[in-house]
Every structure is written in structure tokens, then in C-alpha cells.
Amino acid sequence: MSRYRGPRLRLIRRLKDLPGLTNKTLKSKKAQIAIDQSASKKISQYCIRLEAKQRLRFNHGLTERQLLKYVRIAGKAKGSTGQVLLQLLEMRLDNILFRLGMSPTIPAARQLVNHRHILVNNRLVDIPSYRCKPKDIISVRDQTNSQILVKKNLESLNKDQIPEHLTFSSLEDNKPQGFVNRIVTRDSIGLDINELLVVEYYSRKA
């Protein structure tokens, strides 16, 4: 299953806010009433688990196969499968760029990486799924177009919104740079999600 490329507001109406996918929100009262009415209807446990899975998948811009791969990796790791799953997704390079404010959305961050604008520890990385580690330094290529792209995104940055596992700074030459302090904790996850529902969805399909 490929990545979703349709209208993003349609997804928000169905799955509620997806900050990684879009910074748009439903502002009209009619749309909000429709969501509230649908939420009040009795739905099956399967549909609840499916919605949680879809929220996680669409927020991070993953295909079904990619998300299933992460679930399997998390299942083999020590600790809570759900929390490990969220950590794996949060520590992806495209998500780190988004959480640092270097891009407005995760799809936009993916393009920055694919177009070779991003460095990790002063080395060019063009793989959005690259797994960042503590002490990694995220920076932008020393090229005019790369710097302009990221600095434009940073104009609306609220540093108070940067999670505790990351640090953002501007160097003396005003070049943006991010630092990974540690592995993300559950409290700093960027999406309101019940990860256990996602794990249950896949465990019942296995």
C-alpha cells in the first residue's frame, strides 16, 4: 500500500489532528460537530484499533508495509512493544527534523532529506528513515538554497515546543543545528495516540 497523497483535510475529518501530516486543523463548527457526532456512535473494538493504526501510519507518512516492519522490530526488542514502536518512529530523521522545527511537516522533512539538504554528524544523509541516536548533530548543507529552505521554515519556530530529547541552536554564522540529547521518552511523543491499540491490531491479524 502506497503513501496517502489525497486531500489532507479529509483525513483529519476522519482521524482528527495529525500534526506530522499537516498543520491544518478543522476550524468550522460544522466539521467539528460532525466529528463529535461520529465519536458518540457506538463503534466496534476492531474499528477503534484500526483508527489508532491509521492515525499512526498517516501521521508519520508510512506505507502499511513500513509500519508492519516497525511493529515486528519493536516486538523483538526489550521493553513494551508499543513504546518501542513509538520510539522507533520518533527517532527517524524525517521526524527529528519536524520536531526541531526545521520543516513544517514530516512529508516536507522527507523532501529535505531526499533532496540532500541534511547532514548528520557532518555527513550527508539522504534516507528519511535513518535512525538518529543520542549525541547526533543534525545540520543543513552549506549551500545557499539549503540554508534558505530551512531558515524559512524556522521563522515560525516556537522553541518552547521543542521536546526535551532534542535541542535546537543557531551557530555564530546563523546556521541552524539540532542535537539529539537522548532517546525520546513516552511523555515527549508528538502524537496523541494509544500505542497499545496499534499493537493489538497487528497481533490479532497475525
Swiss-Prot record:
Q: Which Pfam families match?
A: Ribosomal_S4, S4
Q: Which GO MF terms are attached to this record?
A: rRNA binding; structural constituent of ribosome
Q: Extract the InterPro entries matched here.
A: Ribosomal_uS4, Ribosomal_uS4_bac-type, Ribosomal_uS4_CS, Ribosomal_uS4_N, S4_RNA-bd, S4_RNA-bd_sf
Localization terms from the record: Plastid, Chloroplast
Annotated signal sequence range: none
Q: Name which cysteines form disulfide bonds.
A: none
List this protein's GO terms for biological process: ribosomal small subunit biogenesis; translation
Where in the numbering of this chain does the S4 RNA-binding domain appear?
91-159
Keyword Ribonucleoprotein attributed: yes
Its domain of life?
A: Eukaryota
A GO cellular component annotated for this chain's UniProt record is: chloroplast
Q: Which residues form a coiled coil?
A: none
> What UniProt keywords apply to this chain's record, in alphabetical order?
Chloroplast, Plastid, Ribonucleoprotein, Ribosomal protein, RNA-binding, rRNA-binding
What family classification does the UniProt entry report for this protein?
Answer: Belongs to the universal ribosomal protein uS4 family.
What's the subunit arrangement here?
Answer: Part of the 30S ribosomal subunit. Contacts protein S5. The interaction surface between S4 and S5 is involved in control of translational fidelity.
What function is annotated for this protein? Answer: One of the primary rRNA binding proteins, it binds directly to 16S rRNA where it nucleates assembly of the body of the 30S subunit. With S5 and S12 plays an important role in translational accuracy.
HAMAP family, alphabetized: Ribosomal_uS4_B
Quote the protein name from its UniProt record. Answer: Small ribosomal subunit protein uS4c
What organism does the UniProt record list as the source?
Answer: Angiopteris evecta (Mule's foot fern)
